[in-house]
Structures are given as structure tokens and as C-alpha cells.
Amino acid sequence: MNVLIRYCFLFCLCIISVDIVAQTLNNNIKGLVKCQGKGVPNVVVTNGFDCVLTDINGKYTIPYHRDARFVYITTPAGYLPVRKHSLPCYYQRIDGESQTYDFTLIKNSKNDIDHIFLVQSDVQVAKESDIAGYVKYLQDVHQYINKQIKNDELFILDCGDIVGNTPSFFSKYIEASDVIDIPVYRTIGNHDMEYGVRSYEHSYKTFEDYFGPIYYSFNRGKAHYIVLNNNYYINRNYRYIGYIDERTLQWLEKDLEFVPKDHLVFVSMHIPSSSTKELQFNALLPDETSNAASLYDILKGYDAHLLTGHSHYNWNVVFNDSLMEHNTAAVCGTFWKADICTDGTPSGYGVYKVSGNKVTWAYKSIGYPITHQFRVYPVGASDERPEDIIANVWNWDELWKVEWYEDGKYMGAMERFEGYDPEAKIICSDKERVVYDWIMPIKTEHLFRAIPTNKNAEIEICVTDRFGNIYKEKVKTIK
């Protein structure tokens, strides 16, 4: 009798085991990544939790995860995703019915070892008139591309705050963006979240409905691009903090396992990691990324650049020889009420030129040539420093030089100081123009000063960027 019971038990156990294995196999997601009808090997496929490679025939199998909304690919160098106007179609929604998800790639007709990308942030459309401002910006982008960028591989990175708490404008933003026919890779911003939902996990679902996963990656040449969500909704009115959750950090670690150490890495996220070289642990939680140190640790060993927005002003921080942050000023300027930001930076966008694993960059002001890299103020323009000439050099970093000449005589380097941009101060004090009472000028550290020996002399300011490009501007006296 005992033997019979034992055999029955073992038989049942085998049946259960087979059923579990069958369910596991059935729950796997599989598919094919192909180009021109042929499978593409070694393409990274992810469900947001796991990362796998396609085999020699372009096939993949990845575990089903109950919290995964998408299966998506990291577009490999030399290829492009299928595109619906400006929207790259590198992902598919897991619908719960199908287990097979195939992807089609397009062979890039251009050599993407050399490529260019533009960085925009804080478009922040909240009403119809804002769309008109965004269209004007896109016209500037289109003109710049036609004149300066001809046959290079090109795309745009949007660092978030596409709308201003108005998800209903996502479709209008997309429609406007489609005019320039360039792929745009979007990053979620705090004003792109859904507020009033019960938890962080629900705050980004509307964004995903329009633009796909909130974290993902793609390649061009010897550069790896990563988009992250660091807006952590804490469900108290409109409260959020700058924070990258553990799920995203774990995915990032897995994603980077497939990236050679000699490749450039760019990370796009909305909220800055830090506005200072040394992390300030008393910084306001919505203004910086509270666990930025964890991100830095994961990026060690790579030459990495962080691309952020959120602040509505422009600055660069060099953390060390292999890590730098570029915080890009707002496309919307002073919330579409003026074409400069509250630090005096003109509305604009970043232009990054990648060659192999090297990169150069510049800031492009809307309505100006790319040589417009600073603004000068004569004696008397600043009520803070009425005796000084002042230069606002918005894309400055520690490797730039700002020098001045008086009547052709070299006078030396100008002194950097923290203060208010005179024009921004005037604009922000005009409450009828800016409408919002809370708009104020902010102090910036990319201002430079000098006191002329003769205030009526011909003054010229010469700025040299970190790449050796020289920009000159004469100071016009106030009459």
C-alpha cells in the first residue's frame, strides 16, 4: 500500500512539474528582428526587466514579466527603426494575447560613425498659442539643418516637459513635430506625468500611450544613447522628487553589459543629476536627482554625458574627466512670454556632433546663427554692477576663456561672478508681460565682468570655447 501511495505521489509531482514547465515556456515572449527579410543577429531585446540578444538568425526569446507593458529593441549601429513621422517605432505593446513580436529594421544609408543630434528641453505647451511658438522654433531647426547639416545622420533628443500638465496637447505636439521629418526620442518630464493617480507606477502611463517606454536605449556608430525617467511622483498634489527607481537602475546595468567601454554614452533624463560638481545633499528634492551617485557608479568606465533640462536655464558641470552634465535651457524661454530664459540664455537647443567616440557641442539660439554664443552689456546696464561691462556666456564651462580689449589693447581675462542677467531682470519685472507672478530672474554663474578705464572706449569681448572656436562681440555704449 505504501509503495502504491509513493508511486501515485511521484506521478502527480511529475504532472505538476510538466505543467509548470509548459506554463513557463508558454509565457515566454519570442520573435524575430529582421532587415530586408533577413534576421539581424546580436540585437538587444528587452521587456524593461531582462535584456537578451537575438541569435544568428535574428530570433529571440525573453521571459514574460507580468509588470512589463512593452517589448522593445535597442536599435543597433548601422540600422534605423521604422518611423511613423517623428516617432521611432522600436517598441510593441504586450497585449496579453500574442506571444510573438517581430521587429523590422532599416539599413542606415548613411555612415553613422559620424552623426549629429539636437537636444531640446521644456517645450511645455499648455495652450494653443504655445503651439505657435513651438512651430517657430521648429522653423529655426529646419533652417539650421538645411544650411548646416546636409548628409549627416541626424536625430533629436527631447529632455522632457513636452507639455505643461496638459496631456491633451501630446497629439498636437506630435503633429507639429512631424513637420521637420526627423526622428525625435522623447524623455518624460514632471509636467508630462499624470497627476492625481494613486501611485508612481500610474503616473507615466498616459505618456507611454503616446511615446512608448519611459526608459530605453539605442545606438548610433560608437555612441550609446539611454533615456531614463527620474521624475518620481509621490502623490501629494503635484509633488515629485528627482529619483531613479531600482527597477530602472537594474535595467540600466543590464543594458550596459552590451556596450563596449570605448563607446560614448549619453544619458537623457529630465531633472538634472546635480547643478554642482560636488553633490549637495541638502538640494531641493524636485530640482536634482537624489540618488545621482548611484547613476554615476553605474556609468563608471565610460566616457559619459548627461543631458538634462527642467531648470529652464543653461549650465554645464564637469564632474570628472569621464563624466559631464549639460543642462539645456528651455525652448519655451520664459514660458512663451519672452524668448530668453530667466538666466538670460536665449531660447534654443544644443547641437552635438559625434565622430567615432569623440563629441563636440554648441548652443544654438533661436533666430541667431550658431556663432551667437554670448550677450554683452555696457557700463550702466546692470543695477548690481553699474560700473562694469558684463558678458553672459551661457554655454560656458571651465575650459572656456572670456577676455576683453579696450581700444584694441588686451586687458586680460574677465572675472566670473554670480548675478542676474540685466535683460532677464527687466523682463521678469514686467508682470503684465510674463503673466505669472512666480516668474523671477535667477542668479547665474556664467556672467563675466570688467571695469573699463574709459567707459567711452571701444570695448571688444573675445570668447574662446573648449574646442578653440573664437567668438567676438563689441560692446555698444548706452546713449
Residue ranges and their predicted role:
Residues 256-281:
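Short acidic, glycine-rich surface-loop motifs adjacent to enzyme active sites
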Residues 24-29, 35-36, 75-170, 455-460:
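N-terminal active-site segment of His-dependent metallophosphoesterases
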